[in-house]
């Protein structure tokens, strides 16, 4: 979907972070992308980068692959800026426009996580307490969703080395794993993007029941 919406005037360098994609499937992906004259694909095996780290997740639907974001800055040493997309994204526009976002020197460009932000205002106070005492966020309403990221790799390298990122990831108590860590460590260096760049659809009726507990102006921006 990304390449079907790509601009013919731009080149798209697709880099797949992986550990165990078979040679056959790599060839299938390569052959598929060959139909697009302005795209190339490469595969980067992260096995050595994560070797020796005890990485786990707290959610059954989240795999160890979620930590691959932390490896990008080392895997692509000559890149200053990249666009990270979760592999399950459906793209309806030209991501080159998103890549061109001026981050103003910030480390991350990302869309606010309307679900998390709605949870901050729940009466039980669990999420608000977590954001304050575990993530130590000064402004938890700036919490972002990490499925789509414009990454300033130079700034990310200044914040932490890959080893430091992964050492933090080994610590217990993170609910949303690497997403929590990015929010905790990059707070104050985030450019918030329009919601249309990472639309969270209504799952289990959470739009009207969780998301609508977010501040009114934020929820309206999401709905628009």
Where are these regions (language model features)?
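Glycosyltransferase catalytic domains, chiefly GT-A lineage
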Residues: 1-224
């Amino acid at each position: 979907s990304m390449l079907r919406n790509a601009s013919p005037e731009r080149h798209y360098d697709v880099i797949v972070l992986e550990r165990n994609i078979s040679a056959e499937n790599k060839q299938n992906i390569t052959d598929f992308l060959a139909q697009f004259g302005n795209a190339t694909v490469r595969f980067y095996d992260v096995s050595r980068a994560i070797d020796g780290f005890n990485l786990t997740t707290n959610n059954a639907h989240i795999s160890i692959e979620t930590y691959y974001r932390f490896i990008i800055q080392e895997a692509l040493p000559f890149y200053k800026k990249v666009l990270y997309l979760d592999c399950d994204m459906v793209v309806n526009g030209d991501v080159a426009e998103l890549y061109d976002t001026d981050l103003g020197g910030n480390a991350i460009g990302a869309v606010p996580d309307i679900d998390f932000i709605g949870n901050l205002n729940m009466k039980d106070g669990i999420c608000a307490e977590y954001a304050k005492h575990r993530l130590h966020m000064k402004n938890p309403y700036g919490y972002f969703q990490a499925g789509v990221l414009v990454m300033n790799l130079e700034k990310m390298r200044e914040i932490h080395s890959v080893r430091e990122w992964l050492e933090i990831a080994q610590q217990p108590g993170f609910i949303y794993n690497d997403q929590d860590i990015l929010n905790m460590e990059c707070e104050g260096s985030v450019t918030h993007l329009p919601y249309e760049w990472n639309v969270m659809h209504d799952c289990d009726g959470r739009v009207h029941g969780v998301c609508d507990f977010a501040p009114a102006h934020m929820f309206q921006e999401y709905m628009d």
